[in-house]
């Protein structure tokens, strides 16, 4: 879920040198440790309950692996399963074993559920290995017994090898003969070992191969990388039916009264749906427990309402109950929360880790879990994604494009000593307006007071100022004003170059440099449509002469429109830049990047251009 404030785009600068960018096609393997052995064996029963035995050996190759591996958390859900550590020890190069005693196996609450009693069954058992040094092997054997299956009579699992050198990585599934297992395997070799009567054993061994570094903004490794997904579900429709059977909601009298109170005065179905979703967003605290880890059965809608918190499926359950009370039909929609855009070939929860709400009559998707995204918009992480509608078993797709416009007007009044007074007015329209508003509300007063100083400091400027937010207008736009002073905008007397800023922070620079984070690309990457206009004006005193201004730039390709205009008006320099990135998708290919690269390079050069001035 997108939790970082969009204020970054309006207030924080980004600087980067194209020539210093990372290169694609580099090895992504982490050689600090080696997975010498990982063997996972599931023994599954007809009701879906199962036992997992894990036997692993990790070799520490480098010092940095000690901190990452000396404490090994293993998660489980106490309401669904038990977890027992069979054996754990540090094995020294001479063969000596330093055992992990019971005092060094600790249970910790999952961070997301620590303040949420309904989810306190989600815990980590942390194994603390003793005396770990380079050259040691960390040996761990544990057993997890799932006595309550997520879906009665079904089983599914997904595994992704870690980015370490791999010796043996084996997955074994011992199944009842009457529970055929389907698989989606990438870089895993299948075999069928001997099995006991009435059983069938499936085995997959990982075939090690080079794995490229995951590039900046790349889609999830699950979209293209090595993994094994297995499932007893015959198809996604059966998977949807199994989820729906466990996600029934009840409309209680308090829920009905609340829905009526919130919507009775509203004239349209859409207004009612948006109002109810916003109420859940603003009043039900979200607990970030993924589908699967916290089970698949939502708490009763009334319980969620009473407790005022819940995970994604609880949000959906309460919103569905409220919508039903208002006469609006809806369905849960299973989706990936993250940067995975490809469904596995077999139904498995590893990718479908989130659920949102779909209103068929309005063709409207709602996600009330992100407190910073107003109803009618969606978090970026769920845009243009395939969803599984559990009420019908059909597939749907979330919108790819939503309003996203930013404009800013920046004015500097430069003094003879090189300092300057400045004012910046920024307007955010669309999905990011509420994100920005929420970000301001969430800031500590002390942080807000220092915001302008920190922004200036990122440019190497010394100064301060005030940051104010105007009341929302009828369109819900976010409008902010920054007034301040910098002591060292330009290093006079010169002649000297000063960066031709068109906004105080973020904006076009952030968008362009996000594209420029890689010099080459071999993986698909996330690219969100947006439209930004920036104007700036530098007024110089009479004793400062403007010697040169940058040349105008105009660029256009299939996805990018960019222009930069520079004009001298008396002793002032006026800059206007416009950047528009638009495409019907939110994922770009390496070929798209190659086509955009000339424009990206030209935009970077323009953003680094300078105004040359000199004081008499």
What name fits each language-model region?
Residues 1-5:
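Positively charged n-region of N-terminal signal peptides that target proteins for export
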